[in-house]
Structure formats: C-alpha cells, structure tokens
Amino acid sequence: MLCESIRELFSALEPGRRILGIDFGERKIGLALSDPTYLIAIPHSVYHRRNMRQDLGELSAVLRSEDAAVVVMGNPLQSDGLEGEMCQIVRAFAQKLIKKSGVSIYLHDERYTTAMASRATREAGLRRKESQKIDDKISAALVLQQVLDIARAEGIQATGGNNSCL
C-alpha cells in the first residue's frame, strides 16, 4: 500500500526491521538501507535495470535478504513542486512492487538529491566516471536519510509489523 505520510509508513514497520531506500531511474535503481535503529541511511548498491519482471524480482530479493519491511522511494517532483510524467512512472513502479512483495511504500520528495550526491562525490575527489557509478545509491541514501531525520525530529517510531499503512 502507498503510505500518505511518514507516520503511516512507520506504523507499518516492525521495530528493528530495516527500511529500503530507492532512487528509481529509467536505466538504474539506487538502493540504500536504514540501520535497525533508524538513525542513518547507508548506500547499498546500484541495480542496472533489465525488464520489469527482473527489476521487481531483484528488489524483492533485496527486501528479503536485508530484512527490510518497508520502502521509501524518491518522488521526482518538478522544481515547482508539481508532479510530472516521471512521478507517474515512479508511482506505477511502486504499485507493481507493492503487488509483487506486499511492502508499504512512502514516496518522498527527492528534488535536488542527485545534484547533492554529485557534489558530495566531487568534493570527495572522485572522478566523474567513478561518481556516476555511485550517484544513484547516494541519492537513495539522501532521500532515506531525510525521512529518518523527519521521523526522529517528530518523535515517530516503528510501531507496526503488519506491513500495511494505517
């Protein structure tokens, strides 16, 4: 189920289970994971897309292997805050992942995270080619970290375990 808020997402999350962060792209999908205490987001991997069936299978496998119970997915709003065509593509993919794996997903504004990830890798001294290999998983970690920070600031805790938003 698509969650409407961070609070709803955490109501579906059993304490101690991880959150998978996804930066969805047309060619690549960046992945990040929360730590079990929901303090930090850790870049995980970059998955190169193949086809819908394999993409969904790969993400379902990561959810199982990493004990992730819910998903935060970047929502690529336009700079004016409105949803564009890519938002609809992301939402459709999220619905398919929900159907395949049964997880709850929260779509979080990802504006500027790709630029932030690129800047961070540049400042770390990585060459452009090296940076492009990891930008997506860093973007996924940035989106997930924003959600973790908001949850902590608002005192939101994992209380669920039914994997379904309220």
Swiss-Prot record:
Swiss-Prot/TrEMBL GO biological process terms = rRNA 5'-end processing
**EC id:** 3.1.-.-
What Gene Ontology molecular-function terms does this entry list?
nuclease activity
Q: Which domain of life is it from?
A: Bacteria
Task: Name the major location.
Answer: cytoplasm
Q: Does Cytoplasm appear among the keywords?
A: yes
* Location within or outside the cell: Cytoplasm
Of the GO CC terms on this record, one is: cytosol
Keyword Nucleotide-binding included in the entry's annotation: no
Q: Which UniProt keywords apply?
A: Cytoplasm, Hydrolase, Nuclease, Ribosome biogenesis
Q: Which SMART domains does the UniProt record give? A: YqgFc (SM00732)
**Record InterPro entries:** RNaseH-like_sf, YqgF, YqgF/RNaseH-like_dom, YqgF/RNaseH-like_dom_sf
As for family, the record states:
Belongs to the YqgF nuclease family.
Q: What does this protein do?
A: Could be a nuclease involved in processing of the 5'-end of pre-16S rRNA.
Q: Which NCBIfam families does the UniProt entry name for this protein? A: RNAse_H_YqgF (TIGR00250)
Tell me the HAMAP family matching this sequence: Nuclease_YqgF
Designated name of the protein: Putative pre-16S rRNA nuclease
Organism of origin: Anaplasma phagocytophilum (strain HZ)
Taxon lineage: Bacteria, Pseudomonadati, Pseudomonadota, Alphaproteobacteria, Rickettsiales
